[in-house]
Amino acid sequence: MGLFCISLQAHYTARMLKAIVFDFDGVIVDSEPAHYRAFLQIAQPLGLTFSYEQYLKDYVGFDDRDAFRHIFTQLGRPAPDDAQLARLIEDKAQAFEDIVDQGMDTIPGVLDLIAQAKAEGFPIAIASGATRRDIDHILKGLKLSGGFDPIITADLVEYSKPDPTSYALAVKGLAARLPALNIQPGDCLAIEDTAAGIASARGAGLMALGLTTTGSADKLGQAQRVIPNLQGVTLEKLR
C-alpha cells in the first residue's frame, strides 16, 4: 500500500488511487507572491494596503472575487458592487499576467510528477480558485497546456473554497471522461496548500495531501498527510 491508501470512513481500508486533482497556486506554481503584488498594485491606488503576511493569513484560498470583497471589508470599506468588482478582477488579471511574464517558479517536484502521470496515462485534473485566464497563461508558459482534464476554475463555481463544489466538479468531470474507471471521490487525491483547499477537498469526499508551500503544517490538519513540497513524490509513493 502507498502513502494514501486511507479510506474516509472511521476505519482504514486500502483504496486504489485513480486520479489526482491539483490545486494550482502554491501546488503547481509558486504564484502567491505574484498574486499579492497584483492585488496590491490594484488596491493601493484606492488607499488599501496590506502586508504579504496578512495576504497569506487572510486572503489566500479565496478566488479573486471573494479576496477583493474581504480586502475591502477588512480594511473598512464597503464591499465593491458587481460592476466595480468586475473591473477590479480584470485589472488584477492584467497586472498578474505582466508579473508572471517576468518569470514564475514551479513547486519543487511537481513537473516530474505531472510528467510521470502524462507518460503513464494517469488521470490528472485541476481544481483552483484562480481564473481560467490566469491558469491558461501560466500553463502555456510552462508548456503544460492540454495536460489536465478537467480544469475547474473560479469562473465555473459560485463560491470560493472551502465550498466543495470545485472538487466535486473535478471528480464529476474525470468520471464522465473515463467511465470505465468508475472514478469516485474517495478514489481521488487532492493536493493542496491551504486550509480552505483541504476543507474543500475533504468536503467533496477526496483524500488530501497538504503542502507547506504557503503556510505552516498546523493549518492543514484535515489532510491525511502534510509534506513540504512534491520533491521525490512519485505515483508509486502515492498509490
Locate each region found by the language model.
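Asp-based, Mg2+/Mn2+-dependent phosphohydrolase catalytic module
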Residues: 2-9, 15-18, 111, 115-118, ...
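N-terminal helical cap/lid subdomain that shapes the substrate entry/recognition surface
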Residues: 17-24, 28-111, 115-120
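Conserved phosphate-coupling serine/threonine residues in phosphotransfer and NTP-handling enzymes
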Residues: 27, 128-130, 212
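Conserved SAM-binding loop
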Residues: 28, 57, 106, 124-127, ...
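Short linear Ser/Thr-Pro motifs
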Residues: 31, 128-130, 194
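Residue-level signature of catalytic and energy-coupling elements of molecular machines
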Residues: 39, 68, 128, 163, ...
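Residue-level detector of anion-binding/catalytic polar loops
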Residues: 49, 123, 207
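Short, flexible loop segments at the rims of nucleotide/cofactor-binding pockets, characterized by
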Residues: 100-105, 129, 203-205
